[in-house]
């Protein structure tokens, strides 16, 4: 009788389809994989949700991939590293296969579940696979577990397998401490990111330094950490200053369940109680006590000294323009619009049929708006007040047979050089605006 990838009393089946990664949260079904580009290595796409034990609550997980080959294509890195137990091996027929251990799969899912946690109250612990967890290949073939709970997947031909369904989870609770740790080495690392777009900033490698050794229950404040960060910034990037803290996370003895510290208020971190750490003495082979570790990892936004934070909603530097297009013969308003622009250099005529002019603000014809057969006459009124600059462009009908790019105002037989010069500052960005707008 086949073993349905039985993990405890629950069956784990496995289902696949084909492709490579797009930025989506979950895989809805086989149809999703049909649109994915072909892959270079065989992969297991893990797209599962968590179901909280004893409730109807579901926990969403972002999908991820596990490379089933010994080396990623193009020198890349796998998104999830698995232990040596899960590795490719040759079958009797010579084809490569990959054996996935149940514990490795659960660990990879646990790490993905934790990766996007933003609060200490949001931690869940993965218990086991639910009964609907399934692996298939692109043909719908189900892959069953061996007696030891592992699953063997072929890596040739190159394809993707899909692990879907659910894992059972429960709120994380710390285990009772049997042998309390005596002291903790508090280590520190920091990462800086420019708040404003900044091509000059070159982040260095993150160095880890030992801050101090503390006893269980001793404290370190957010101000002490800020001082450490500023000291490192002054040394490596003297032209910058810290703007604000983005995150502070404490990793306890490489435990995946970390302490997330507040980022928007002052805090005091109290060294967490935990089990005493040990290592094996290479000579004696016996366990010996070592200092436990807390790694405090921080991220800060920084600014160039003297620079203000960029505000995408700040319009104080923009100027308001009202553009009116008027029939020169009837004074009928053909079209009106208001524009905000940071540069008056864009106040120039554009040809709607010429993509090179797309940054310019004034139109030499209105065909695109269904107002046909008009062109420039050379008459432009330019009026200013404290908050608005009003440009009135007078337009006339094009001669019959002329196309939309015809410029009546550029015809030297109709307008003198002096008349053309009157409005030239609107057409040539290098010509200054008159001191007195009425002197035109």
Curated annotation (Swiss-Prot):
An annotated GO cellular component: extracellular region
Superkingdom classification of source: Bacteria
Keywords assigned by UniProt, alphabetized: Plasminogen activation, Signal, Virulence
Gene3D superfamilies per UniProt: 3.10.20.150, 3.10.20.180
Keyword Glycoprotein annotated: no
Signal peptide range in chain numbering: 1-26
UniProt key word Signal: yes
Function: This protein is not a protease, but it activates plasminogen by complexing with it. As a potential virulence factor, it is thought to prevent the formation of effective fibrin barriers around the site of infection, thereby contributing to the invasiveness of the cells.
Protein name: Streptokinase C
Origin species: Streptococcus dysgalactiae subsp. equisimilis
